[in-house]
Amino acid sequence: YILMNIAYCIKLKQKAIVDVFIIAVGFVFRLLVGGFATGIWVSHWIILMTFLLALFLAFAKRRDDIVMFEETGVKARQNVDRYNVVFMNQAIGIVASITIVCYIMYTVSVEVIERFNSQYLYITSIFVLAGIIRYLQVTIVDVKSGSPTKVLLKDRFIQLCIVGWVIT
């Protein structure tokens, strides 16, 4: 993890696409280390969902950087000129789609149904789908995905999706 961060700081953050994947892998590393440190088994589902969600958010954030660069000429990142909005919209759409499908597969997997003793977990997919679509709207229409934390704290629709997901 430390070597990956050093490589990222020195060179990899300058490489388009690689930079975003490194960020997502970093979240997976933290998840694995946390699981190991606490003695909690980390399922392949949580690893996959963590990676995909981090990738989705990182691409959305990069898109915000691109829009800022195109509007002001200010580079938030060195590699911002290696991306464009059309490419980012495609990448975000692909990752969002894969994330949703993966989550639905998770909710209907035998392992998860048995673990939670419920055949109705798939209902939570409604809130995941709505939340991701709303985040796409915030990213593409509102152009306000520069800070995922700020979106989470301020967007009532996304907050309601999270509450609905937790309740179901």
What do these predicted regions represent?
Residues 1-8:
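Internal transmembrane alpha-helices of multipass membrane proteins
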Residues 10-15, 21, 28-168:
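C-terminal membrane-associated helical module and adjoining short loops/tails
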